[in-house]
């Protein structure tokens, strides 16, 4: 009766004098307990009731009071936060396992050029360590792919790999994404949210376009890199995480340091190991391997059978300078696969 009411209204209930209450005294569960007063409050998450907290007093001289109701509501709120965090973590575990399967298929660093051989050797040496890695290179060269390869070849490979583009968010939103926020921390923060660093605990976090991060967020990131705990936005609880950081940039961080746009101490913290990914125009011998890899994968995805590239189409790919690097090559081949009509990719595609 009371439980149904709380589930329906989402409001807590304090009931006194149960033995003399006509609606309650014959309830078998209350009779078995010998309850004289009770409290029932919901454990809420957004607009759903996840469960109930019951508190009973069997002593008629020590009836539960309003203060007891407030205390039980506070306990239910804490339980709600714990359950919400557990659900978020469970969701992340499932998502990370799905992504991990995709990563195994996508993390092969395609190429036999001297530059790619050197990259693979660097990854093999650095992956087994806990060192922070700074991946540098032009946009589209595959910096995230390098970060994924480092993670999947490291002792943390069973942990999560969390990726975040630092240039895609405003400073306040980036801080919330990185470190999380408490309910009510700002307009629109209707629920507590764990940040990327918490989500990446025992794993790796990849911070792309780190050079675009604003000074205020840089300072907080530096403290985390130094092993210090952090707090969620709007919170006071200290949170400690064990996370490996791999950062990437396509800007000149040294100039940014000189200009005061990037903290010098953070630069040195990030610049423990540097991996520079060459542009596609500097490893053109890898273009046939990359082109055929993308063709096989993308044609399978759309359900088309394509034999390969015509000689003239491949010569055209080799002559082009690829300012957008591997990303541009992949996009071009995807467009040809989707729009093409023959069993071979030609120069007109």
Predicted regions and their residues:
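A short, aliphatic-rich beta-strand micro-motif
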Residues: 36-44
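Nucleotide-binding/hydrolysis machinery
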Residues: 156-159, 234-244, 251-349
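Conserved post-Walker A coupling segment in P-loop NTPases
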Residues: 108, 122-188, 198-214, 279-284, ...
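Regulatory sensory and allosteric helical modules in signal-transduction proteins
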Residues: 1-27
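Flexible nucleotide-interacting loop at or near the entrance of a catalytic core
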Residues: 80-132, 136
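Signal-transmission/dimerization alpha-helices at domain junctions
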Residues: 8-12, 46, 71-89
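Sensor-regulatory modules in signal-transduction proteins
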Residues: 43-46, 230, 280
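Regulatory loop-to-helix N-cap segments in sensory/regulatory domains
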Residues: 56-74
């Amino acid at each position: 009766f009371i439980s149904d009411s709380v589930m329906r209204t989402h409001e807590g209930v304090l009931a006194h004098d149960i033995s003399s209450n006509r609606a309650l005294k014959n309830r078998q569960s209350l009779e078995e307990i010998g309850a004289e007063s009770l409290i029932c409050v919901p454990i809420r998450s957004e607009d759903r009731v996840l469960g109930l907290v019951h508190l009973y007093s069997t002593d008629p001289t020590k009836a539960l009071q309003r203060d007891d109701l407030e205390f039980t509501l506070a306990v239910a709120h804490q339980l709600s936060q714990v359950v919400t965090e557990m659900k978020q973590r469970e969701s992340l575990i499932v998502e990370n396992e799905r992504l991990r399967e995709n990563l195994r298929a996508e993390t092969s660093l395609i190429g036999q050029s001297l530059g790619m051989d050197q990259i693979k050797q660097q990854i093999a040496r650095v992956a087994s360590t806990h060192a922070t890695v700074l991946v540098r290179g032009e946009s589209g060269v595959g910096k995230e792919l390098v970060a994924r390869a480092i993670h999947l070849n490291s002792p943390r490979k069973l942990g999560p790999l969390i990726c975040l583009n630092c240039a895609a968010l405003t400073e306040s939103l980036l801080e919330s994404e990185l470190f999380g926020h408490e309910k009510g921390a700002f307009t629109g923060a209707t629920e507590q949210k764990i940040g990327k660093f918490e989500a990446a605990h025992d794993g790796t976090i990849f911070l792309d376009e780190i050079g675009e991060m604003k000074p205020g967020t840089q300072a907080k990131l530096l403290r985390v890199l130094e092993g210090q705990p952090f707090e969620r936005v709007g919170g006071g609880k200290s949170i400690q995480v064990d996370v490996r950081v791999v950062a990437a940039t396509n800007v000149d961080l040294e100039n940014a340091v000189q200009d005061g746009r990037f903290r010098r101490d953070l630069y040195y913290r990030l610049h423990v190991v540097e991996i520079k990914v060459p542009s596609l125009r500097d490893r053109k011998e890898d273009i046939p391997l990359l082109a055929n890899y993308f063709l096989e994968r993308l044609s399978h995805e759309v359900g088309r059978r394509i034999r390969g590239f015509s000689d003239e189409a491949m010569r055209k790919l080799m002559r082009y300078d690829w300012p957008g690097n591997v990303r541009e090559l992949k996009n071009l081949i995807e467009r040809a696969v989707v729009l093409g009509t023959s069993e071979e990719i030609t120069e007109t595609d």
